[in-house]
Amino acid sequence: MNETLKCVVRQPSVLGECPVWSVREQVLYWADILAGRLHRLDPRDGSVSTLQLPEELGCFGLREQGGFIVALRSGIYLLDAHGQLGERLAENPTGAEHSRFNDGRVDPWGRFWAGTLWQPRDRNGGQLLRVDAEHRAQVMAGDVMVSNGLAFSPDRAWAYHSDTPNHVLYRYPLDEDGQPGTRQLLREFARGSGGRPDGAAFDSAGCYWSAQFDGGRVLRLSPDGQVLDEIQLPTRWPTMVAFGGEDLRTLYITSSRENRSAEELADWPLSGCVFATRVNVPGCAEPLFAG
């Protein structure tokens, strides 16, 4: 076990996801998707505060103007810092009856991307939606069962995107305006106890840190998809990572306890908690939504 690994939030989420470090505030935000909650951790004193939203909260980004852009089950909305829901910018592209938003983030050009997962998970019905600063929405990709692992390389040359139940990691080349090209298969993960690719983030060296759901670890992958390092965790169900701290060398990791039996939770009691560990390579500051 990594000697610097700590549990920094012991109050568990049902499905903790989408950790986002605010450089401006020096705090960590994350979502409890199924509870519709947006949490905020101040690591200086360990305090946690929460905004309760009216629907499941798949993912979110921070805004230049303050507040958030949030992907709820029914669509993408603006949200102020006090939790007041504002304008709806886009509907769920795959329909709220059979899907919800899952993973997403703001790209280096200040646009918000959010992917959906198909319910039930019997087809590749998930899509990836982008909302720009003028609040125009466009479907950018599809043909996935669970849209996940979206991250943009620090040189702005690539977008990585995983499909968790299908055990695959893709990448898209990006042009100078951030428009994606043809999808490429970067890595197919072995089926078994090693886990499935969930949420992720890039470090400043261009390596991709991927939470391995049901595998109890985080992998650091080279730009061509080779495993360089791994961090073992006290839960089998990590969901996503984010770089934070003043030097962006603290790796925060969210996790899940959704649908776990009493026996599983007895074996893994910290499931749903937030963890942090120090790493050698800093991450990248999370961009802000320009709209």
Curated annotation (Swiss-Prot):
MF (Gene Ontology): calcium ion binding; gluconolactonase activity
Instruction: Give the cofactor binding note.
Output: Binds 1 divalent metal cation per subunit.
**Cited InterPro entries:** 6-blade_b-propeller_TolB-like, SGL, SMP-30
Is Cell membrane there in the keyword field?
A: no
- List the SUPFAM superfamilies: Calcium-dependent phosphotriesterase
Is the keyword Metal-binding assigned to this protein? yes
**Which co-factors does it depend on?**
a divalent metal cation
The UniProt entry annotates the active site at: D198
The biological process GO terms on file are: L-ascorbic acid biosynthetic process
Query: Gene3D superfamilies, per this entry?
Result: TolB, C-terminal domain
Upregulating conditions: Is highly up-regulated during growth on sulfoquinovose, compared to growth on glucose or succinate (at protein level).
Binding annotation for a divalent metal cation: E17, N148, D198
- Reactions this protein catalyses: 6-deoxy-6-sulfo-D-glucono-1,5-lactone + H2O = 6-deoxy-6-sulfo-D-gluconate + H(+)
Enumerate the UniProt keywords alphabetically. Hydrolase, Metal-binding
EC assignment: 3.1.1.99
Q: Which family does it belong to?
A: Belongs to the SMP-30/CGR1 family.
PANTHER family this protein is in? REGUCALCIN
Say what the protein does: Catalyzes the hydrolysis of 6-deoxy-6-sulfo-D-glucono-1,5-lactone to form 6-deoxy-6-sulfo-D-gluconate. Is involved in a degradation pathway of sulfoquinovose (SQ) that allows P.putida SQ1 to use SQ as the sole carbon and energy source for growth.
Protein name (Swiss-Prot/TrEMBL): 6-deoxy-6-sulfogluconolactonase
